[in-house]
């Protein structure tokens, strides 16, 4: 009997456990599995990786089994998402925050896989991209409140995410009327004189030029300022968890935008510059603009926009609010010209008399009473940022295939900028449509130089082999290399050598087009003034360093000599002399001032041109001149292309004129002249008085006067008189009173 009871209990527990693993987490996730790996062990590994010095110890390893497969994660701290000036701001302080709990990696042995997440208290939370789709890992208590669970985390596949509002009449972004009101408001911005000409200049049409590949660093990174309100903090519980969520969202959109070719503009990335966390303690803070519980989505965006965000490309607020009509996010739409808003927009005055920054947006993780899966929230964030980048909602059959009657097109789903939220499980859900790419390309072309920065991170596809890359031949439309995978290949494969290839020409000139090292006799670098030609060594694609030419070899057009392979010495040193500067104080003309001059060591009085008789035994009468632009005349001027020394006047012509007029020497010279030639000054004074008296006498008889006792003025002789044609004699009319005339004039 006891045995039967135990058997029944055991079967019940197994059945219950199996049912629990198959039950949905909420109405959006229909299947999950539990994870119960050793959290203490992972926490210790995280601490070791955090303190690691060696390259090998910096990697964090996590192994577990779920969904019928094994996950062997190899991860490393991710520093690419946070700028060097990254700060975390709270109501009490601004902190230099440690982001060592943020990791990026891959599945060991699975090419093209990718993982990103955080390790907090020994638990991994994030997403894992595999060839079979993307898996999401989250803490179990976020969904299941039972503390007696035999697992601490849940993992589910993106195919098990079913978002019921994706094609419904509501959910996702705001409706057309909201965007129309926002568009009209954006048109009322008052331009300020501090704006750059690039911001004010309007383009006549799309300017979608293909960019040539360049090896110079591009401004391709949009720096973010992200705030979270007290409700967002309340849901996730800790500061570390909040930052992990922000990191996950930014990494998700970074992956989407980096892999999109915006008409030749590539590698667009994102970096967090500052985070403001409003905790539950800020709920009653009167300075907290987001403290009220019931704020509509438009007002919530307005509160974010009323702050000055000039230091950032974009500024977002993350919240946990259930907005009306299922809205998950809202943002100002950018434009290349004609209206305010979007990336790089500066604070300015608008029609309501308020200064606002319209480079803003908001995101919520709650919809219709339930928290949306991270996948949906990530796509929403990418969607709203797409608005900031200049894309309106997709429309037309070309850009909304999910509404097509063609089953093949409909199966691929809609693109990121579709008006309603998507679950992200369709092929097109993580891509931009051609309509969006055209719009975003115009805005990037116009505005990115106003606030985008260089990422400082290795970029696969820029033609330079950087850290973490084996080779770099560019993108698929640029790569002519048979040895290297181009930048359009998946993660773990791009910018890597193809199997069986020794090298790639992108690594250096000592690799052939057939992916083999050149022989030891082949030249890879021409000789220079101070270095011999470079010769390949047969074991590397890089061209080895060239041997230096002998010291005191002439270089730089015989004006200098080589020292240890560098053109760094003066030609004077070749003959045991020192270089000096010929100065005008020594009686040199402006042409000789641009000669190379030498002197005996410690004897400045011997300074003379190389063409002088004094140094004829060294230079054989050959005059060596300085290079155009070189300083001359004891650094008071520079040599022009005609080898003449042009003096430098830092003050400019206006300052010279001021000095000439107000110079004390000028007035001293005038005073001395007056003393010496007093009689001339006296004669000039008498002549001036007589001239003025004569002018008055002559002109007074022709000047009218109001004095009735004076005779009338005499007409000037020889003046032209205006002849008027004879007028017909008219009968005199009775003059109307002044009042009557004025009233008649007003009536007319």
Curated annotation (Swiss-Prot):
SH3-binding (motif): residue ranges: 708-715, 722-728
Chain ranges of the Disintegrin domain: 457-551
Mode of membrane association: Single-pass type I membrane protein
Induction of expression: By interleukin-1 alpha in nasal cartilage.
PTM text: The precursor is cleaved by furin and PCSK7.
Catalytic activity: Endopeptidase of broad specificity
Active site as annotated: 384
Primary location group: Golgi
GO cellular component: adherens junction; axon; cell surface; clathrin-coated vesicle; cytoplasm; dendrite; glutamatergic synapse; Golgi apparatus
Subcellular location per the Swiss-Prot or TrEMBL entry: Golgi apparatus membrane; Cell membrane; Cytoplasmic vesicle, Clathrin-coated vesicle; Cell projection, Axon
Residues bearing glycans: 267, 278, 439, 551
Signal peptide: 1-19
Effect upon mutating residue 579 to A: Abrogates EFNA5 cleavage
Site residues (Cleavage), renumbered to this chain: 213-214
Required cofactor(s): Zn(2+)
Statement: the UniProt record of this protein carries the keyword Signal: yes
Segments on the Extracellular face: 20-672
Comment, domains: The Cys-rich region C-terminal to the disintegrin domain functions as a substrate-recognition module, it recognizes the EFNA5-EPHA3 Complex but not the individual proteins PubMed:16239146. Both Cys-rich and stalk region are necessary for interaction with TSPAN5, TSPAN10, TSPAN14, TSPAN17, TSPAN33. Stalk region is sufficient for interaction with TSPAN15. The propeptide keeps the metalloprotease in a latent form via a cysteine switch mechanism. This mechanism may be mediated by a highly conserved cysteine (Cys-173) in the propeptide, which interacts and neutralizes the zinc-coordinating HEXGHXXGXXHD catalytic core of the metalloprotease domain. The dissociation of the cysteine from the zinc ion upon the activation-peptide release activates the enzyme.
Oligomeric and partner information: Forms a ternary EFNA5-EPHA3-ADAM10 complex mediating EFNA5 extracellular domain shedding by ADAM10 which regulates the EFNA5-EPHA3 complex internalization and function, the cleavage occurs in trans, with ADAM10 and its substrate being on the membranes of opposing cells. Interacts with the clathrin adapter AP2 complex subunits AP2A1, AP2A2, AP2B1, and AP2M1; this interaction facilitates ADAM10 endocytosis from the plasma membrane during long-term potentiation in hippocampal neurons.
Protein name as annotated: Disintegrin and metalloproteinase domain-containing protein 10
Organism: Bos taurus (Bovine)
């Amino acid at each position: 009997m006891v045995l039967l009871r135990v058997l029944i209990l055991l079967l019940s527990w197994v059945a219950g456990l199996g049912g629990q693993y198959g039950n949905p987490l909420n109405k959006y996730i229909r299947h999950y599995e539990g994870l119960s790996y050793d959290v203490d062990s992972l926490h210790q590994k995280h601490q070791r990786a955090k303190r690691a010095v060696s390259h090998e110890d910096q990697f964090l390893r996590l192994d577990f089994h779920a969904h019928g497969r094994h996950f062997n994660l190899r991860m490393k701290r991710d520093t690419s998402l946070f700028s060097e000036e990254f700060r975390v701001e709270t109501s009490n302080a601004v902190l230099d925050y440690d982001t060592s709990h943020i990791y990026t990696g891959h599945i060991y042995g699975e090419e093209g896989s990718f993982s990103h997440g955080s390790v907090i208290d020994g638990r991994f939370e994030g997403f894992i991209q595999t060839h079979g789709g993307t898996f999401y890992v989250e803490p179990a208590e976020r969904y299941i409140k039972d503390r007696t669970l035999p697992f601490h985390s849940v993992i589910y596949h993106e195919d098990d995410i079913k978002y019921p509002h994706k094609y419904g009449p509501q959910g996702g972004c705001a409706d057309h009327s909201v965007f129309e009101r926002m568009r009209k408001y954006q048109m009322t911005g008052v331009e300020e004189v501090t704006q750059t000409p690039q911001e004010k200049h309007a383009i006549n049409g799309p300017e979608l030029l293909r960019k040539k590949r360049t090896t110079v660093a591009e401004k391709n990174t949009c720096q973010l300022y992200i705030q979270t309100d007290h409700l967002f903090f309340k849901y996730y519980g800790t500061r570390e968890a909040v930052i992990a969520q922000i990191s996950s969202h930014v990494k998700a959109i970074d992956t989407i935008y980096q892999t999109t070719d915006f008409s030749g503009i590539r590698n667009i990335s994102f970096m967090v510059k500052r985070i403001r966390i409003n905790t539950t303690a800020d709920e009653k803070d009167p300075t907290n603009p987001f403290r009220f519980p019931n704020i509509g989505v438009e007002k919530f965006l307005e509160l974010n926009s009323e702050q000055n965000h000039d230091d950032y490309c974009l500024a977002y607020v993350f919240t946990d609010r259930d907005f009306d009509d299922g809205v998950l996010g809202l943002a100002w739409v950018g434009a290349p010209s004609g209206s305010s808003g979007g990336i790089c927009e500066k604070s300015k005055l608008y029609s309501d008399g308020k200064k606002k920054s319209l480079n803003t947006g908001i995101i919520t993780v709650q919809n219709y009473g339930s928290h949306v899966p991270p996948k949906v929230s990530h796509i929403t964030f990418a969607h709203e940022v797409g608005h900031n980048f200049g894309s309106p909602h997709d429309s037309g059959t070309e850009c909304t295939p999910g509404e097509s009657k063609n089953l093949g097109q409909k199966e691929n789903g809609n693109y990121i900028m579709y008006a309603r939220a998507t679950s992200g499980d369709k092929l097109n859900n993580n891509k931009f449509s051609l309509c969006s790419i055209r719009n975003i390309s115009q805005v990037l072309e116009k505005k990115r130089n106003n606030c985008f920065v260089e990422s400082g991170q290795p970029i696969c596809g820029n033609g330079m082999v950087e850290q973490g890359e084996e080779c770099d031949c560019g993108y698929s439309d640029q790569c002519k290399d048979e040895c290297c995978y181009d930048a359009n290949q998946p993660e773990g494969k791009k910018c890597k050598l193809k199997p069986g290839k020794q090298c790639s020409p992108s690594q250096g000139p000592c690799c052939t087009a057939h992916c083999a090292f050149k022989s030891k006799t082949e030249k890879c670098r021409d000789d220079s003034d101070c270095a011999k030609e470079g010769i390949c060594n047969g074991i590397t694609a890089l061209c080895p360093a060239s041997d230096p030419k002998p010291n005191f070899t002439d270089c730089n057009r015989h004006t200098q000599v080589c020292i240890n392979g560098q053109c760094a010495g003066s030609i004077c040193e070749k003959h045991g002399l020192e270089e000096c500067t010929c100065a005008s104080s020594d009686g040199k003309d402006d042409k000789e001032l641009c000669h190379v001059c030498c002197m005996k060591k410690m004897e400045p009085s011997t300074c003379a041109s190389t063409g002088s008789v004094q140094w004829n035994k060294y230079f054989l009468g050959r005059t060596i001149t300085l290079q155009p632009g070189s300083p001359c005349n004891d650094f008071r001027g520079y040599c022009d292309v005609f080898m003449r020394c042009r003096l430098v006047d830092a003050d400019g012509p206006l300052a010279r004129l001021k000095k000439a007029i107000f110079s004390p020497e000028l007035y001293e010279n005038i005073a001395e002249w007056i003393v010496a030639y007093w009689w001339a000054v006296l004669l000039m004074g008498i002549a001036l008085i007589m001239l003025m008296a004569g002018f008055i006498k002559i002109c007074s008889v022709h000047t009218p006067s109001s004095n009735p006792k004076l005779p009338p003025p005499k007409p000037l002789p020889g003046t032209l008189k205006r002849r008027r044609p004879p007028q017909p004699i008219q009968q005199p009319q009775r003059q109307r009173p002044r009042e009557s005339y004025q009233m008649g004039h007003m009536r007319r």
